[in-house]
Curated annotation (Swiss-Prot):
Its main location: membrane. It is found in: Cell membrane. It holds the Pfam family MacB_PCD. GO terms for cellular component: plasma membrane. This is Uncharacterized ABC transporter permease protein Rv0987. It comes from the Bacteria. It comes from Mycobacterium tuberculosis (strain ATCC 25618 / H37Rv). The complex is probably composed of two ATP-binding proteins (Rv0986) and two transmembrane proteins (Rv0987).
Length: 855
């Protein structure tokens, strides 16, 4: 027989096709294992890319063709600068007011609001206006509170020119009039306009309370010389940045979030690899006598190798294709969860369309096929190296597994040490950390065979005394088929350990956050403007409300806070700043580092001696402890501020700078108040005070008055909602593991049909057969569950102490609950028992004569 390419050797392919028709269920399991793993990766990619594209489109609608823009502090840019630029011949400049509003008349959703000068727009955002005759939009310039929308949005909500639209701008209710409809030239422009309201610059200044100020000035600069000349004319506190700066900043904000989701989906794929390995191994083991006959007839080792590899390649292609389709479908469902999390923690975004990129599909295709080939390689090599005589012996593979035991311990030590080294390496590289995490997980999975053998051999005598011969047979059967059972146990262990690890890490985060909220938010009443999303307030409190509430009877102290973003030149990005008039924790705030005496910290802080940094800020900027003074761009130029302390904070993974309000007002000329924290006098009742304030401000939509307890509950609700995706990933990994156990038990059932047929022939009842199967599956599930507990704890420690710190900069306290461990054991045992029901049913219905007949 000639050694020819496997694809050209028709008889071998006919045997493979007959095998597929005889045992379709095994190949279905193989395809499912690949499909589910690929689906999760593609789903995460699709949902993340859709959110990123939605932001890119909304940013492009604002940015247009501008190459640079001039920006300043929280109060914006003085519009006189725009006038001066025009006077000096810089015609490629345009004023912009930009912000988010809650469009109550447009589905009660957050939308971008842009104020522009239509006469300066042609060079910047012409695609939005290309099909529009500005002369027909006279009301755009002359009508008070006149706005324009895309024709598609207006039709969706049944609006016509002249209709009024209710908005909430910076927390204050207002009404605008639709004075015109935009008809974009193409679909991309239409998508850009789907979440955009446009008004004249003067209308926007009035609505956003920015008289004489601009959010930024857009520029089109074609050479460096022009950029240099403009920069030389800029007043103190104004800077020039490229138009891509905001997009890059946003991408950096969400990178850690996306990487963490992708890593969790890879764990589901890792469980799928175990399933593929288990299924292919069984296919090889079951066909060993047939392969021996083929080898005797002259089929070469290489032909057997390529037959097995190509079978898996075909299954991998089918599974990957199915996984891509499922992933796109799941991605559509995950978009809402991903978008909500981004809205809660980062920025406002609305995703209208699913974005499926070629890169996402190619990534899923490569990963799926690579996973299938990687998992198939060991059994294919084993089949290739086995000589015909040993191939005919059923015990040869199991004897090899027994000889392999010491080497599995060596591999466990080597791979585990490599993983620990990767985790130990300093730096904030998440990819290195996840390589270490996966190395440790695979190392722990490698010891499943020796541990299973060790435990089962010691359980057999005890179970024999307790349950009789069947109790002794069950653990011994697991050991006799260790090449299949140990892989199924490892797959289930990986899935359940993911459940334990993520549950502990999420529980630790939740408990740490709850404790932090309890000690940090010590005020009795919280006053704020309404929010666009579940995140921080979008506007500021009315001046009259601040004045009246701070003097309200029963209020001992009113701490005022102002949230804003300022530019840090040394870090090249805007940072979040919170200016406060006092300590909202009433002296209970936890600190990571303090300069000097803690008792004098707040007196020094309120005297303007320095600022405080949150722990994530220190981590994100890789600052040394103690941190050096930081530089911030103020209205009068860059100013340096000493750092007095580093405090614990879980409100933002981007970091927060805490500054006293007096210093903030002096440097940025900003008297606005975003929120108020009210401390009541002794004997005052918070419920009664809230009722009084709500009655006094009844009918006003620009003030929200609630107890601090309600704020804590809302924070915990947002936290729980943000981890919904994680729970979904856990579920998929468990489903894949369930399929793996089912595959292993089906393999054992087919492989042991002759043996069990003999047992039935000598008197074993169907009831005893069911009992044997359930003891075996229960032992496998229990073993997987017991191994998953320490593995899950190790995974949780890595997630909490390393991955979390590198991703978000938060230090969390490990928190263990017995419920996590009990639930994991229950899931492992129940999954194994459930997977054993179908094989037990099949065995119970088998014909004894057929089962005991040898070929």
């Amino acid at each position: 027989m000639n050694d020819q390419a496997p694809v050209a050797y028709a008889p071998l392919w006919r045997t493979a096709w007959r095998r597929l028709r005889q045992r379709p269920f095994q190949y279905i399991l193989l395809v499912l294992g690949i499909a589910l793993g690929v689906a999760m990766i593609v789903a995460i990619d699709v949902s993340s890319n859709s959110a990123q594209r939605a932001f890119d489109l909304s940013a492009a609608a604002i940015t247009g063709k501008s190459t640079h823009r001039l920006v300043s502090g929280p109060a914006g840019v003085d519009q006189q600068l725009y006038v001066d630029l025009r006077r000096h011949g810089y015609d490629f400049s345009a004023p912009v007011i930009e912000g988010y509003v809650l469009a109550r008349g447009l589905g009660n959703r957050a939308m971008q609001f842009m104020g522009t000068d239509p006469f300066a727009e042609s060079a910047f955002r012409s695609p939005l206006w290309s099909n529009q005759n500005i002369a027909e939009l006279g009301g755009f310039l002359t009508r008070p509170n006149g706005v324009v929308l895309s024709r598609q949005v207006a039709q969706k909500y049944g609006l016509a020119v002249g209709d009024r639209i209710a908005l909430q701008v910076k927390g204050a209710p207002t009404t605008v009039t639709l004075v015109g409809l935009l008809t974009p030239a193409d679909e991309v422009s239409n998508q850009k306009l789907s979440d955009l309201i446009i008004a004249d610059i003067s209308t926007a200044q009035e609505l956003f309370h920015m008289p004489g100020r601009l959010s930024h000035i857009d520029l089109i600069i074609k050479d460096e010389a022009t950029a240099t000349r403009i920069q030389q004319r800029l007043p103190a506190g104004v800077r020039m940045e490229t138009s891509d700066t905001q997009r890059d900043t946003v991408k950096q904000m969400t990178d850690a979030f996306t990487v963490n989701l992708t890593a969790l989906s890879l764990i589901a794929l890792l469980v799928g690899i175990f399933l593929i390995y288990n299924t292919v191994t069984f296919n090889v083991v079951q066909r060993r006598p047939f392969f021996a006959i083929l080898r005797c007839l002259g089929v070469t080792r290489e032909q057997l190798f390529w037959l097995i590899m190509t079978e898996s390649l075909v299954a991998g292609l089918i599974g990957t294709g199915l996984g891509l389709l499922i992933g796109i479908w799941l991605g559509e469902g995950l978009i809402g969860l991903v978008t909500q999390t981004i809205n809660d923690f980062y920025f406002v975004i609305n995703v209208r369309n699913v974005s499926v990129s070629a890169e996402s599909l190619l990534k899923g295709l490569i990963i799926g096929i690579f996973a299938a080939m990687l998992a198939t390689l060991p059994p294919a090599i084993e089949a290739m190296r086995t000589v015909p005589a040993s191939t005919l012996r059923r015990s040869s593979l199991e004897s090899k597994i027994t000889k392999l035991m010491p080497w599995l311990w060596v591999a466990w030590f080597g791979l585990g040490s490599f993983g620990v080294l990767m985790l130990w390496l300093p730096g904030n590289n998440l990819v290195v950390a996840f390589v270490g995490l996966f190395s440790v997980l695979i190392a722990l999975a490698l010891i499943a065979p020796p541990l299973t053998r060790f435990v089962m051999l010691r359980l057999a005598p005890g179970l024999g005394r307790l349950l009789g011969p069947i109790g002794r047979m069950a653990p011994r059967n697991i050991v006799r088929s260790l090449s299949r059972t140990s892989i199924a146990i490892a797959a289930l262990m990986m899935a359940v350990s993911l459940m334990v690890g993520v549950s502990i890490s999420v529980g630790s985060f939740r408990q740490t956050l709850a404790n932090w909220l309890e000690v940090t938010l010590k005020s009795d009443v919280y006053v704020s403007p309404p929010t666009l999303t579940s995140g921080r307030p979008s506007g500021n409190l009315p001046v009259d409300a601040v004045r009246n509430i701070s003097k309200w009877p029963g209020v001992r102290d009113a701490v005022m806070a102002r949230y804003s973003s300022v530019f840090a030149p040394d870090w090249g990005r805007e940072v979040e700043l919170m200016a406060v008039s006092g300590d909202i924790s009433d002296g209970k705030r936890p600190y990571r580092w303090i300069d000097g005496n803690k008792d004098t910290l707040w007196p020094r802080f309120l005297a303007g001696k320095g600022v405080m940094l949150s722990e994530p800020m220190v981590s994100r900027q890789h600052l040394q402890m103690p941190p050096r003074p930081i530089t911030l761009m103020t209205d009068s130029g860059p100013q340096t501020f000493p750092v007095l302390a580093v405090f614990s904070d879980y409100t933002s993974d981007q970091g927060v700078i805490l500054m006293d309000r007096a210093s903030y007002r002096a440097h940025w000329q900003d008297d606005d108040v975003t929120t108020m924290f009210l401390f009541l006098a002794s004997g005052a009742n918070s419920g009664a005070l809230i009722d009084q304030l709500q009655a006094a401000f009844a009918g006003r939509e620009d003030i929200v008055i609630q107890s601090t307890h309600s704020v804590r509950e809302a924070s915990m609700f947002i936290f729980d909602r943000s981890f919904t995706i994680t729970i979904a990933l856990q579920l998929v990994a468990t489903v894949v593991a369930f399929i793996g156990v089912l595959s292993a038990l089906m393999s054992l059932e087919l492989d042991r049909a002759h043996e069990l047929g003999v047992f039935r022939a000598i008197g074993m009842t169907t009831r005893q057969l069911w009992k044997l199967m359930f003891i075996e599956t229960g032992l496998m599930g229990g073993m997987a569950g017991l191994m998953a507990l320490p593995t899950g704890c190790i995974l949780a420690w890595i997630l909490v102490r390393i991955i979390n710190v590198r991703s978000f900069g938060w230090t969390l306290q490990m928190h263990f609950e017995s419920a996590h461990f009990l639930r994991a054991l229950l899931v492992a045992v129940v999954a194994a028992l459930a997977a054993g029901m179908y094989p037990a049913w099949r065995l119970g219905r088998m014909t004894i004569r057929t089962a005991i007949r040898e070929e």
